């Protein structure tokens, strides 16, 4: 039987939601992750230090794992102050601020309409050593949804990188060859997270033979040439790329609807799904760096010191999983997952 023991991984991009669903989402993500960076796009968004610490307390109240710790982020708005950034940084629990272009994804209406409006805040973040996380898509209606990431790189991200060379930036959940190349060619302060579903699937999986709403996420799945570029980046051993699931649950009826929500749920099997990708590429030896080393190294945090063991043993993912008083349909629902965490 094939086994693989790696340093305990972290998830550098996770949605836990809030309220009664935390019992389920914290359980799923806390099974084997050491840390998870929690996204702030609640309703209302997590824009203050007090809100972030209160949210952390609600998460910890449901946390049954001694080895799992949530790291928090602030939702960056055009009303965010430098004082708030300094206060957040001083807590030791809030490690980043997230830039959402207004309207780019779930609960992003409070986001930034013009990045120049937050330049004073980015200057403070650069001075304080707080990381900037970016949802890298433009939101103007004249730009095709499949081109929004590429346009963002050229018109928004490149100027930020140029104007704030000491600011550490994570381009979240990249979906294109263009984004992978941008990160590779940028300086040492630019990195990216990559999701399991963008490595495993492309837009054909979502659209051919009927619309598959549980593959619908933002940024949207792209063509297979972009998928393969992401696989190459993730499995290459390049320290600029690391694990961020963007596991984003919505209740079953909110996905299977005339106007369904964006987000795919992978927290039930995240490291197992990544292992499939690395095995398929013959790069299992690089999984540990991607999942367990590159993220904490970029964040200047210590690596986890304990381990988990994966076994090459297929199991069937559940058709649905508990999500508070409702249900979520996970990726690979009713289908085989090739690896199992023992």
Curated annotation (Swiss-Prot):
Binding, substrate: 15-17, 41, 135, 218, 250, 262
Give binding positions for Zn(2+) 2.
98, 135, 173
Q: What class of enzyme is it?
A: hydrolase
Record: residues binding Zn(2+) 1: 13, 15, 98, 246
- Please name the Pfam families in this protein's record: Amidohydro_1 (PF01979)
Q: List the disulfide bonds.
A: none
The superkingdom of the source organism is Bacteria
**Cofactor(s) required for function per UniProt:** Zn(2+)
Q: Which positions bear N6-carboxylysine?
A: 98
Catalytic activities:
(S)-dihydroorotate + H2O = N-carbamoyl-L-aspartate + H(+)
GO terms, biological process: 'de novo' pyrimidine nucleobase biosynthetic process; 'de novo' UMP biosynthetic process
- Indicate the quaternary assembly: Homodimer.
Q: What is this protein called?
A: Dihydroorotase
From what organism does this protein derive?
Aliivibrio fischeri (strain ATCC 700601 / ES114) (Vibrio fischeri)
The organism's taxonomy opens as: Bacteria, Pseudomonadati, Pseudomonadota, Gammaproteobacteria, Vibrionales
Corresponding gene? Answer: pyrC
């Amino acid at each position: 039987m094939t086994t693989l023991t790696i340093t305990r991984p972290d998830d550098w991009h996770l949605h836990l939601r809030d309220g009664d669903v935390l019992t389920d989402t914290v359980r799923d993500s806390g099974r084997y992750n050491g840390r998870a960076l929690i996204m702030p796009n609640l309703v209302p968004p997590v824009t203050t230090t007090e809100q972030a610490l209160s949210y952390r307390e609600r998460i910890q109240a449901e946390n049954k794992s001694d080895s799992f710790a949530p790291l928090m982020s602030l939702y960056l708005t055009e009303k965010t102050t430098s004082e708030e950034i300094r206060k957040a940084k001083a807590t030791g629990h809030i490690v980043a601020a997230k830039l959402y272009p207004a309207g780019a994804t779930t609960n992003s209406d409070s986001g930034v309409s013009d990045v120049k409006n937050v330049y004073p805040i980015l200057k403070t973040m650069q001075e304080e050593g707080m990381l900037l996380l970016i949802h890298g898509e433009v939101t103007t209606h004249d730009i095709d949804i499949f081109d929004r990431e590429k346009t963002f790189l050229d018109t928004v991200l490149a100027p930020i990188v140029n104007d704030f060379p000491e600011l550490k930036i994570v381009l979240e959940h990249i979906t294109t060859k263009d984004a992978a190349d941008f990160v590779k060619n940028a300086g040492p302060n630019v990195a990216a997270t990559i999701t399991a579903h963008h490595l495993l699937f492309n837009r054909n999986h979502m659209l051919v033979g009927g619309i598959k709403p549980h593959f619908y996420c933002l940024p949207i799945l792209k063509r297979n040439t972009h998928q393969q570029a992401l696989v190459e980046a993730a499995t290459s051993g390049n320290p600029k790329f690391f694990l961020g699931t963007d596991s984003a649950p919505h209740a079953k009826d909110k996905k299977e609807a005339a106007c369904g929500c964006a987000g795919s749920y992978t927290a039930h099997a995240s490291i197992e799904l990544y292992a499939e990708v690395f095995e398929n590429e013959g790069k299992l030896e690089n999984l540990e760096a991607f999942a367990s080393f590159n993220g904490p190294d970029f964040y200047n945090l210590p690596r986890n010191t304990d381990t988990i063991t994966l076994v090459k043993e297929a199991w069937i993912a559940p058709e649905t999983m508990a999500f508070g008083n409702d249900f979520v349909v996970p990726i690979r629902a009713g289908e085989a997952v090739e690896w199992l965490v023992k």
